[in-house]
Regions:
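Helix-centric, low-specificity signal for extended rod-like, repetitive segments
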Residues: 14-17, 111, 171
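Conserved Ser/Thr-centered positions that define the repeating blades of beta-propeller domains
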Residues: 180-182
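Amphipathic/hydrophobic helical signal segments and adjacent flexible N-terminal regions
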Residues: 2-11, 17-78, 202-212
Length: 212
């Protein structure tokens, strides 16, 4: 998910966003702390029925994942960091938001945190994804969807080079996220990030049609 000086990726909208109830129609949910009212109103328990089968593309990831993040540095070495990713439906189930967190390491005192917002564009017939990493002044747009047995998203990185993000080896309790960049207009691709995810025990969510 973009290489923030190769140190880490990630987001923040509070972990409570994943468990709140949807509020389609009527007043927004009331919370004891007004500072959390927006978070409560944002979350949805399920995808919106209008998405149909497209909901399955990212619904399979809803929940919390423990991550082994690996960053491929320019000198050929690979740096590993631990972290987590959280997926959940938002905006009346019309979009998915995910939080990417890498834990402090390599002398850093703060975690790295960023967010992706994913929604299905009914005109383009593709998923559009916006990723933001405020700590690194980073933002990027991609779009794509299912391609065979994986999810592929394409866009342009902040340095103007083509990038390709993909979800691979997708299983009920694991998947591999890969970030690649091309320096020859898409003829060849170099892996910059490869992150191995395992679902946290007890954090499995049934998919829209009951299939993991």
């Amino acid at each position: 998910m973009a290489t923030f000086d190769k140190a880490g990726i990630c987001f923040a909208l509070a972990l409570g966003v994943l468990g709140a109830r949807p509020t389609q129609g009527g007043p927004s949910s009331q919370t004891a702390d007004p500072r959390k009212a927006m978070i409560a109103a944002l979350a949805s328990a399920n995808p919106n029925p209008s998405l149909g089968d497209e909901a399955r593309t990212f619904d399979r990831f809803v929940g919390t994942w423990d991550c082994d993040f690996s960053f491929h540095l320019d000198d050929g070495t690979v740096r590993h960091q631990r972290g987590e990713v959280l997926f959940g439906w938002i905006l009346d189930g019309r979009a998915v938001q995910d939080i990417w967190i890498t834990y402090p390491a390599y002398g850093r005192k703060d975690r790295a945190i960023g967010t992706s917002l994913r929604f299905f564009d009914t005109k383009l017939k593709q998923w559009r994804v916006i990723f933001v990493g405020p700590q690194f002044n980073y933002a990027v747009n991609t779009q794509g969807g299912l391609e065979g047995e994986r999810i592929v998203l394409r866009g342009t990185d902040s340095d103007g080079l083509p990038l390709r993000w993909s979800f691979n080896e997708m299983k009920a309790d694991s998947f591999v996220w890969r970030g690649e960049k091309s320096r020859d207009g898409g003829k060849t691709w170099k892996v910059e990030e490869e992150h191995h995810m395992k679902r946290r025990p007890g954090h499995r969510a049934a998919s829209a049609d009951g299939v993991p």
